[in-house]
């Protein structure tokens, strides 16, 4: 059986500000932005452009969901953005005003730093050690 995770839902306050952040600051590609009139919502998918999962940007449909914007994993790192050049991407992100909450560090598995997205979700920027 061959399976893969295709989409990860990320609850956002506003579609357009989230699209702007992910496409302009992280260089993600906007894969789809389709209005669904029967549900009065948009189907918005962004991707880092390589193989793997994409993000489905979803606005909350009830107050319980809204409460988790920026804290979908209870303060733990939520997503891991792999790169082939840590310092290139780190410096680019810093120049665009992205907040790093843990500075770059060499670990046995690679170089890593933790940044916050526009809502406060924590991400690892990581370049894995070549084996």
Functional labels for PLM-detected ranges:
Residues 14-15, 84-87:
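Helix N-cap motif at beta-to-alpha junctions
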Residues 12-15, 37-39:
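Conserved beta-strand-loop-alpha-helix junction that forms the acyl-donor binding cleft
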Residues 1-7, 29-81, 90-116, 126-131:
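Vicinal oxygen chelate
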């Amino acid at each position: 059986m061959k399976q893969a995770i295709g989409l990860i839902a990320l609850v956002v306050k506003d579609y357009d500000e989230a699209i702007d952040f992910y496409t302009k600051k992280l260089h993600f590609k906007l894969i789809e932005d389709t209005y669904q009139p029967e549900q009065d919502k948009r189907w918005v998918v962004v991707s880092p452009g390589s193989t793997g999962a994409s993000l489905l940007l979803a606005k909350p449909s009830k107050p319980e969901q809204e409460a988790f914007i920026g804290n979908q994993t209870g303060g733990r790192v939520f997503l891991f953005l792999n790169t082939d050049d840590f310092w290139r991407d780190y410096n680019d992100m810093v120049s665009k005003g992205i907040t790093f909450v843990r500075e770059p560090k060499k670990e046995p598995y690679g170089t890593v730093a933790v940044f916050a997205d526009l809502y406060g979700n924590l991400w690892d920027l990581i370049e894995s050690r070549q084996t």
